[in-house]
């Protein structure tokens, strides 16, 4: 399955399970950790936990058996590592505080070339 298809499936799973403010960020040429980052909000700690567990379960059905959840002990953040797509699930206040969308959406500065006189 292509990475873009995996991303679309994840977005659909999140939407079907009432995740809020689902945002996808293209990380190609910005990071080697993944091709895409998806950020979404949940309404409660339990909702975040459910979203992360549902994602892993649904991705297993698509043949992605080794996805994992980080932040199991956190009440306001979960991360699902789906290899080329990473998913951050936040309580709205924590999402606003960390503002990953702004950080990862900005252009990467290009190195300046100096010529010697």
Regions found by a protein language model. Name each.
Residues 115-117:
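Conserved small/polar residues in nucleotide/adenosyl-binding loops
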Residues 12-16, 53-64, 105:
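Short, intrinsically disordered, mixed-charge
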Residues 26-41, 73-78:
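Short, charge-patterned binding micro-sites
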Residues 2-20, 46, 91-108:
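Long, contiguous binding/interaction regions
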Residues 21-26, 65-69:
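A short linear hydrophobic-aromatic micro-motif
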């Amino acid at each position: 399955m292509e990475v873009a298809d995996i991303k679309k499936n994840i977005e659909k799973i999140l939407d079907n399970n009432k995740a809020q403010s689902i945002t996808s960020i293209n990380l190609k040429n910005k990071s080697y950790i993944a091709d895409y980052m998806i950020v979404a909000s949940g309404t409660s700690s339990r909702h975040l936990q459910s979203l992360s567990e549902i994602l892993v379960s649904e991705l297993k059905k698509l043949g992605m058996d080794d996805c994992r959840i980080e932040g199991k002990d956190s009440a306001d953040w979960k991360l699902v590592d789906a290899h080329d797509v990473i998913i951050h699930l936040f309580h709205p206040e924590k999402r606003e505080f960390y503002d990953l969308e702004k950080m990862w959406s900005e252009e990467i500065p290009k190195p300046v070339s100096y010529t010697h006189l």
